[in-house]
């Protein structure tokens, strides 16, 4: 696979200069990865434009190559091209480093659990085809954290209505629910369905991230799909209390899987 020409996009420009600097040092992709604490495969992905660098990676690259904020200055342009909402790229960076994730989703199956077809259906409204595919690719890229050697522990609370709210038609929804059942078997993923008659009315969906040695972060999505990154300790603590309240109303793991299977049968 050949990377795109550096004139095509900020990401391609970034990739071209990353490879140029790496080869100038005589370093292999794994060797560079070891120096900046990422895998050689991620270095390869960045150079092929299939992976987006995080802000921390940009800063580390400048450090090891002895550059004055060259890659860091490119980061906002790379993020801008993804079409992600304000605050979300920073959240995605924090998500990639998280050791634990707690999330509540009230409208759709959460992004890191979505199949490509389901994600495309969810994101399609009002998007130009090229931007849509960038958004889908970014969402699929985020899911790689679930498959890494030491994945985060994820506890997901899904409102029961998301199991019946169809995106993309019957077959797309069927594949999505089957995928959800597969994920529920993974030891680091805990999925709980919140019954529709639970006496709760949270304002919107949210995710809380925890990392060893780092302060917690959160992302809250409100009506209309607008979201914001949260680093206020008090607000994050309130979300933690809300998460536990919702979890107290949710089904256990076994009953949650039964609810997903029932939704499958009713398609």
Language model features: what each stretch is:
Residues 100, 104-267:
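Hydrophobic protein-protein interaction segments
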Residues 1-79:
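Basic, Lys/Arg-rich alpha-helical nucleic-acid-recognition elements, primarily the DNA-binding modules
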Residues 1-2, 11-14, 28-33, 80-82, ...:
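Short hydrophobic/aromatic-rich motifs at helix boundaries and adjacent loops
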Residues 43, 82, 202-205:
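Short secondary-structure transition/capping segments
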Residues 4, 72-104:
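Short, charged recognition helix plus adjacent turn
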Residues 52-54, 65, 91-94, 215:
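Short, structured secondary-structure boundary patches
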Residues 34-36, 91, 258-261:
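Short secondary-structure junction/hinge motifs that connect adjacent elements
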């Amino acid at each position: 696979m050949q990377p795109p020409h550096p004139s095509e996009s900020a990401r391609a420009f970034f990739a071209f200069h990353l490879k140029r600097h790496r080869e100038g040092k005589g370093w292999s992709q794994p060797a560079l990865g070891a120096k900046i604490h990422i895998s050689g495969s991620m270095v390869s992905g960045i150079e092929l434009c299939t992976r987006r660098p995080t802000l921390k990676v940009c800063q580390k690259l400048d450090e090891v190559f002895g550059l004055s904020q060259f890659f860091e200055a490119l980061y906002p342009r790379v993020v801008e091209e993804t079409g992600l909402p304000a605050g979300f790229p920073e959240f995605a960076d924090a998500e990639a480093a998280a050791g634990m994730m707690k999330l509540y989703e009230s409208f759709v199956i959460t992004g890191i659990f979505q199949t490509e077809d389901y994600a495309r259906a969810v994101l399609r409204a009002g998007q130009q085809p090229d931007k849509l595919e960038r958004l889908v690719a970014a969402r699929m890229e985020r899911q790689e954290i679930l498959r890494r050697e030491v994945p985060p522990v994820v506890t997901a609370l899904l409102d029961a209505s998301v199991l019946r709210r169809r995106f993309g038609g019957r077959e797309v929804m069927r594949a999505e629910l089957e995928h959800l059942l597969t994920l529920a078997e993974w030891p680091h993923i805990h999925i709980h369905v919140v019954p529709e008659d639970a006496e709760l009315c949270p304002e919107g969906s949210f995710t809380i991230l925890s990392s060893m040695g780092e302060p917690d972060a959160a992302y809250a999505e409100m009506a209309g799909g607008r979201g914001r990154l949260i680093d206020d300790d008090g607000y994050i603590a309130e979300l933690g209390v809300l998460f536990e309240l919702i979890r107290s109303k949710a089904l256990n793991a076994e009953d949650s899987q039964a609810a997903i299977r029932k939704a499958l049968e009713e398609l």
